[in-house]
Amino acid sequence: MSRPIILDCDPGHDDAIALILALAHPELNPLAVTTSAGNQTPDKTLKNALRILTLLNRSDIPVAGGAVKPLSRELMIADNVHGETGLDGPALPAPSFQPQAVNAVELMAEKIRQSDKPVTLVPTGPLTNIALLLASHGELHAKIERIVLMGGAAGVGNWTPAAEFNIFVDPEAADIVFKSGIPITMCGLDVTHQAQIMDEDIERIRAIPNPVAKCVAELLDFFMIYHRAPKWGFVGAPLHDPCTIAWLLNPALFDAQDCWVGIETQSELTLGMTVVDRYQLTGKPTNATVLFGIDRQGFVDLLVDSLAVYTPTYLNRR
């Protein structure tokens, strides 16, 4: 039985790869793709989702744009990481179809309402759309099985010393999500910084004889540029967002622990910090399964094997 999911993203190189990974596996049933501002401006992230789905010949999946800014803050973007288009590197096709007339929140609500099984939400950008959905459609909470998100860190941040980018962009939205009572899997920097793709892995991907793998290799070529800065201490580039999909496909690849997680929304120094109570110091009930470790080679093998699925026959099956 396939698991119904909705991907809420801000493509973004690693968002695009997460989407490509998800659509290689029939055990995941993408009901919709929604977008928000984050890695680039809202018009660009929406276009990028359409471009990736066009590459995959999946115009059957409805797409809607969502929040153009955080709940109560000014928008910031990560164009220094993802380039002018948000997906700099490969020559992607122009979108072959249009987004839905409704916004992201209403598309998500419609798909959750219509689904005969509880839906898993997979946000890989700022949590604004998810927070708006939860705030405006309380009647649908029981139909959301889990939220598997990329964001946060138990340790250091990557946008400030304390905060990871997705949470820092809209900490008030993250606060709503983590207080919702819906089961959460948190794929934070603790695990995603271990999910590094190396030069030799990119060459494995480049050797796969299909256009989707070629596109991913070229996305990674560009993504590597930012992460080669000595300050990070990386050998490769961390594939943050695909960790969400990898966990859905094979949670045995990960080490996890149930923790209470709170979001800092006020401090000047630690705004956007995910406060992870790994040692139950607060006595508060756990609200998230936090990923701390990963089988990196197993993760890379999953990605490589998934990209090999995109043969001409697979791409033209619909």
UniProtKB/Swiss-Prot annotation:
Statement: the UniProt record of this protein carries the keyword Hydrolase: yes
Any one Pfam family match given in the protein's UniProt record, by short name: IU_nuc_hydro
GO MF annotations, alphabetized: purine nucleosidase activity; uridine nucleosidase activity
Active site, per annotation: 240
PROSITE patterns the UniProt entry points to: IUNH
GO cellular component, one term: cytosol
Keyword Hydrolase: yes
EC class name: hydrolase
GO biological process: one example: purine nucleoside catabolic process
NCBIfam families for the chain: PRK10443.1 (NF007761)
Known function: Hydrolyzes cytidine or uridine to ribose and cytosine or uracil, respectively.
Protein name as catalogued: Pyrimidine-specific ribonucleoside hydrolase RihA
Natural source organism: Shewanella sp. (strain MR-7)
Lineage of producing organism: Bacteria, Pseudomonadati, Pseudomonadota, Gammaproteobacteria, Alteromonadales
Gene: rihA
